[in-house]
């Protein structure tokens, strides 16, 4: 009889261990899913990824304290449905380009200005339009963060229910193992470039063992999965972006596609263009090919037949194709996004990546700078402007550590004597001034800045032995206008290229105040305590803040050591 009891006891414990493992698995899997998916569909969260992370943590924490409660579970499917419907249909709801309603926002650029323009049509008062933007910003961000918290309360309840059964050490060990499994599986799915329907399907399958007795919940899960079918064969999901890739109509008389448009996270990112002499001689006025040709020719108007070329931010291959057209002996092409590279390899009209003279490196630029022993006649920085962050646990854009003083110094060390660097960028004035100042600091003398107008405000910065030749090219030399008194240079210690000065944006501060006060109110109303209730709670509050700071610092520092492609 005792053996039977022992067997039943072990079975009971093993069953509960499995449930705790999968609850923890689901919690971390959904956390990464929401952060990754949300940032592609509602742009503001691409720059505020730490806030959805905090909302997930808050929901899981409250749920673990609550445990499973019928009232919370009854609301769970509807909270989840609302959250995923908002994310899925954000473009149709005009939520994708909700912007930052402060001066920092106005320096970001992009389609967010369409929101301001629409509001200005409703009123002639600029400040009223800004206040309306502020209201939209707060409603959208706080509303979405509230839905995230509510959804994760139930998931945290599953974890808490089974965690309390075990002694702390064993329970935490199972919880940690499940959490790591969730991270590994989601990372693997991102590596495979799977679409959101796969993430959502697997995520809700993980929750079925906890809710299988509730047919309404299962029906809602099925609805959420079904609404994620699509959006079409021309949409791809890389580890960093949602990518939409479309062929443009070929010019009259051409039988094949000569230009493709690549968008990331619903905004234009780059073209893949046929700029070959054969095509351009037959179709000299074809657009956007004619418009772009002069910019891609600049480096080779300075350095003819280079023996070795490094292209940083190779993308779909326009810069690589230009190097091959001008007789480059060998080209190292560095691109962090494997899906963009794959699209370029398959569809670029000139097929530059098929050339035996090209070596492809799927890597972070900084990591490549530190690893390579090669020296180059010509280094070309393509248009690297990033529209995402490199980690769910940081507030840095994917390209921030490329545009720092230390990065440019590393690139300079890869130049051969007499070599040339051409850095192209399309930014707002203070960003262009900052890049000018960083190049001057890295090389010891100012660059030549030529206004190309590519992508609206494109500038090509030239450093190296061919600067005098650069001044003879048929582009306006705007170097004098970019001198910036007392410039704030981006460094590895302060890599925020897109902030005009050392500050915390007001829009972010407002959100943080609302979150802190709202969290305290939530804890008081649901648990009867707040973080200010006594010394112990205040200590836990600051320990949590310290944890987030150390986590963010660790992730950003690790990216410098091994490259963001591996973080």
Describe the role of every protein-language-model region:
Residues 1-566:
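Alpha-helical transmembrane segments of multi-pass membrane proteins
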């Amino acid at each position: 009889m005792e053996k039977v009891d022992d067997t039943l006891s072990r079975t009971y414990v093993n069953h509960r261990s499995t449930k705790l493992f999968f609850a923890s698995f689901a919690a971390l899997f959904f956390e990464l899913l929401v952060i990754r998916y949300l940032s592609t569909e509602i742009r503001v969260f691409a720059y505020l990824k730490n806030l959805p992370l905090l909302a997930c943590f808050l929901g899981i924490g409250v749920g673990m304290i609550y445990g499973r409660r019928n009232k919370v579970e009854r609301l769970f499917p509807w909270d989840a449905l609302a959250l995923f419907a908002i994310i899925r249909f954000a473009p149709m709801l005009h939520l994708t380009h909700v912007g930052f309603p402060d001066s920092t926002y106005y320096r970001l650029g992009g389609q967010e200005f369409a929101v301001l323009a629409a509001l200005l049509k409703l009123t002639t008062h600029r400040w009223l339009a800004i206040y309306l933007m502020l209201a939209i910003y707060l409603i959208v961000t706080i509303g979405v963060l509230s839905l995230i918290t509510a959804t994760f309360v139930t998931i945290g309840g599953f974890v808490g229910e089974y965690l309390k059964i075990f002694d702390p050490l064993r329970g935490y060990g199972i919880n940690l193992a499940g959490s790591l499994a969730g991270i590994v599986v989601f990372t693997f799915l991102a590596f495979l470039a799977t679409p959101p329907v796969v993430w959502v399907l697997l995520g809700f399958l993980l929750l079925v063992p906890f809710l299988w007795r509730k047919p309404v919940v299962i029906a809602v899960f099925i609805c959420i999965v079904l609404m994620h079918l699509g959006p079409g064969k021309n949409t791809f999901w890389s580890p960093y972006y949602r990518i939409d890739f479309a062929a443009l109509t070929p010019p009259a008389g051409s039988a094949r596609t000569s230009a493709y448009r690549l968008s990331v996270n619903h905004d234009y990112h780059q073209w893949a263009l046929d700029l070959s002499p054969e095509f351009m001689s037959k179709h000299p006025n074809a657009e956007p090919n004619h418009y772009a040709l002069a910019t891609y020719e600049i480096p080779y108007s300075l350095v003819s037949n280079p023996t070795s070329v490094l292209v940083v931010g190779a993308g779909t291959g326009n810069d690589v194709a230009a190097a091959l057209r001008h007789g480059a002996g060998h080209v190292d092409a560095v691109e962090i996004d494997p899906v963009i590279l794959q699209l370029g390899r398959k569809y670029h009209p000139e097929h530059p990546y098929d050339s035996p003279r090209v070596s492809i490196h799927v890597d972070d630029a900084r990591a490549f700078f530190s690893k390579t022993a090669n020296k180059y006649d010509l280094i070309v920085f393509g248009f690297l402007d990033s529209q995402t962050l490199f980690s769910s646990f940081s507030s840095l854009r994917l390209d921030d550590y490329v545009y720092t003083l230390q990065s440019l110094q590393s690139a300079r060390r890869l130049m051969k004597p007499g070599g040339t660097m051409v850095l192209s960028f399309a930014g707002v004035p203070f960003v262009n001034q900052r890049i000018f100042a960083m190049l001057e600091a890295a090389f010891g003398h100012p660059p030549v800045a030529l206004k190309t107008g590519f992508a609206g405000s494109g500038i090509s910065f030239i450093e190296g032995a061919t600067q005098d030749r650069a001044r003879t090219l048929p582009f306006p030399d705007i170097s004098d206008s970019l001198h910036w008194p007392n410039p704030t240079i981006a460094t590895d210690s302060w890599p925020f290229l897109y902030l005009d000065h050392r500050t915390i944006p007001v829009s972010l501060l407002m959100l943080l105040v609302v979150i802190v006060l709202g969290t305290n109110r939530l804890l008081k109303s649901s648990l009867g305590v707040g973080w200010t209730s006594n010394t112990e709670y205040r200590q836990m509050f600051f320990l949590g803040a310290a944890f987030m700071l150390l986590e963010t610092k660790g992730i950003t520092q690790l990216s410098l050591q091994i490259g963001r492609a591996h973080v």
